[in-house]
């Protein structure tokens, strides 16, 4: 059979497996690639190829992650699987592998376990928008009522964390049997793939979102005005459009009078491009690194937010000692460090290196932010943690 060439025409979606240790996440990942390759073409990946996950560094944090790809007739999927619980925590908080949807694997023999709950909570905190459930090891449960009970428990758990538990697709299967080529269970993998296609909507592309450019540098060009440079994070800015400068100080409205890239003039700057944007009537001192240029009204500056953070372990170059309430590090957003104070949850007195924790942060200056924005926690320029804005407060 000839090798399929990679089709860029298919919509691309990022997914991953989450769930309790030993419930079969990696076996399921192998089963999906194997069954879909057999059914629709593509390449299968063996369990041990996936299980020996290579180490990656994201924001200085060591994460073991396996990446596999597979196709359905409708879409191309990139799928992440992590060997250890700590890897999941780090992956979800740093956004190293952004997920448009997740497959929650729950062993029917065990039902929901502590990490099942923790992964659902993390999914809610870091903004995983959709979860599909795969009830695994159903070949080992003879009692239909027991399966009903486990399914009900999982649905209730999802609802508890504001996922639509009643409407979530739940597929009952056996990853191992499917991997062994048992047709009855292979059909369940196809059912799962169909659920991925139908339940997870096509993600919005960065270019279709409202314009935003984190400002990295500001120059004054005599006779022309002020130029800000940076990489367009999302959307498009066209010459002649109104834009806002947001963050740190009061928001200012201005107009984009020119866009240039590599000293060439353009009529627009698009997501992913490094550009200089010329601003009409804006003084050099009105703009600074750390602010963002954005479509008017699309983003607001905030100082207080709830976040989910991972604190680097000593081995990762993090702190050697715990920190307590009253800790005042810098929070690095996009291009700037801002000092902030923290509030720990009720009953949490200290946070150890290697822990993940929910905390409320109060910044001394407002930063343009939305839920889902990633940040680093730094002490004197050294990264000691990573976090994500779970919910803007004020």
UniProtKB/Swiss-Prot annotation:
Annotated region described as G4, given as residue ranges: 136-139
Matches recorded under CDD domains: EF_Tu, EFTU_II, EFTU_III
G5: annotated span: 174-176
Enzyme Commission number(s) of this protein: 3.6.5.3
Residue span of region G1: 19-26
Pfam families: GTP_EFTU, GTP_EFTU_D2, GTP_EFTU_D3
Annotated region (G2), positions in chain: 60-64
Localization per Swiss-Prot or TrEMBL: Cytoplasm
Family: Belongs to the TRAFAC class translation factor GTPase superfamily. Classic translation factor GTPase family. EF-Tu/EF-1A subfamily.
Function statement: GTP hydrolase that promotes the GTP-dependent binding of aminoacyl-tRNA to the A-site of ribosomes during protein biosynthesis.
PANTHER family per record: ELONGATION FACTOR TU, MITOCHONDRIAL, ELONGATION FACTOR TU-RELATED
Protein name per the record: Elongation factor Tu 1
Taxon lineage: Bacteria, Pseudomonadati, Pseudomonadota, Gammaproteobacteria, Enterobacterales
Gene coding for it: tuf1
């Amino acid at each position: 059979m000839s090798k399929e060439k990679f089709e860029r025409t298919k919509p691309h979606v990022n997914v991953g497996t989450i769930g309790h240790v030993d419930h079969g996440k990696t076996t399921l990942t192998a089963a999906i690639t194997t069954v879909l390759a057999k059914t629709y073409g593509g390449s299968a990946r063996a369990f041990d190829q996936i299980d020996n996950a290579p180490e990656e560094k994201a924001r200085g944090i060591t994460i073991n992650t396996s990446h596999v790809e597979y196709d359905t007739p409708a879409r191309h999927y990139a799928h992440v699987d992590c060997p250890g619980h700590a890897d999941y925590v780090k992956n979800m908080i740093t956004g190293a592998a952004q997920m448009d949807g997740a497959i929650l694997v729950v062993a029917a023999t065990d039902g929901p376990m502590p990490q099942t709950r923790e992964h659902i909570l993390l999914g809610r905190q870091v903004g995983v928008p959709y979860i599909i459930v795969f009830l695994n090891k159903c070949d080992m449960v003879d009692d239909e009522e027991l399966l009903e009970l486990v399914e009900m428990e999982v649905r209730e758990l999802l609802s508890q964390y504001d996922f639509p538990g009643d409407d979530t697709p739940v597929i009952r299967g056996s990853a191992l049997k499917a991997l062994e080529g048992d047709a009855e269970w292979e059909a369940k993998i196809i059912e799962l793939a169909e659920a991925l296609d139908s339940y997870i909507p096509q993600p919005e592309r960065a270019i279709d979102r409202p314009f935003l450019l984190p400002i990295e540098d500001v120059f004054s060009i005599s006779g022309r005005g002020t130029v800000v440079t940076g990489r367009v994070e999302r959307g498009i800015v066209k010459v002649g459009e109104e834009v806002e400068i947001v963050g740190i100080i009061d928001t200012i409205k201005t107009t984009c009078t020119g866009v240039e890239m590599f000293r060439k003039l353009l009529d627009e700057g698009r997501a992913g491009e490094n550009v200089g944007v010329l601003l009409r009537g804006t003084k050099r001192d009105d703009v600074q690194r750390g602010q963002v240029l954005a479509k008017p009204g699309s983003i607001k500056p905030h100082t207080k937010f709830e976040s989910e953070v991972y604190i680097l372990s000593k081995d990762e170059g993090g702190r050697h000692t715990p920190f307590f309430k009253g800790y005042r590090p810098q929070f690095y957003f996009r291009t700037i460090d801002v000092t902030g104070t923290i509030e720990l949850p009720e009953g949490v007195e200290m946070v150890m290196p290697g822990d993940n924790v929910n905390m409320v942060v109060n910044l001394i200056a407002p930063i343009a932010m939305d839920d889902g924005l990633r940040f680093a926690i730094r002490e004197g320029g050294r990264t000691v943690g990573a976090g994500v804005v779970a919910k803007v407060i004020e």
